[in-house]
């Protein structure tokens, strides 16, 4: 997939973090889509791309599924620590 050419949007606060975590774990977007499906989130490649680019809002159930698929806590995904 080619790199994003437009600047990120401002519709959500987790898109950039999802990309960074996914890339740190060496998970391709296609593989991440499959992983999301295994945790119960059926999302299209376009929708995931828009989420990662911060061009769409994120639903609460999507946050839960993304955290589960990345094997991290919701707090870590949101950038918050438990004692903040």
Predicted features by range, described:
Residues 1-25:
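A short, Lys/Arg-rich alpha-helix, primarily the initiator
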Residues 57-58, 70, 77:
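Short amphipathic alpha-helical segment with a characteristic S/N-K-E followed by hydrophobic residues
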Residues 23, 34, 68:
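Alpha-helical residues within the helix-turn-helix
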Residues 55-65:
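Short, basic-rich loop-to-helix N-cap that marks the start of a DNA-contacting helix
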Residues 65, 76-84:
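Short amphipathic recognition helices of helix-turn-helix/homeodomain-type DNA-binding modules
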Residues 19, 23, 37-38, 53, ...:
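Residue-level detection of the helix-turn-helix DNA-binding "recognition helix"
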Residues 26-50:
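Short alpha-helical DNA-recognition segment
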């Amino acid at each position: 997939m080619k790199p994003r050419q437009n600047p990120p949007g401002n519709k959500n606060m987790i898109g950039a973090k999802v990309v960074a975590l996914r890339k740190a774990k060496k998970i391709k977007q296609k593989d991440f889509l499959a992983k999301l499906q295994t945790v119960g989130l059926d999302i299209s490649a376009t929708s995931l791309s828009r989420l990662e680019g911060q061009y769409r809002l994120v639903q609460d159930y999507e946050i839960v599924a993304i955290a589960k698929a990345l094997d991290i806590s919701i707090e870590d995904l949101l950038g918050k620590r438990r004692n903040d």
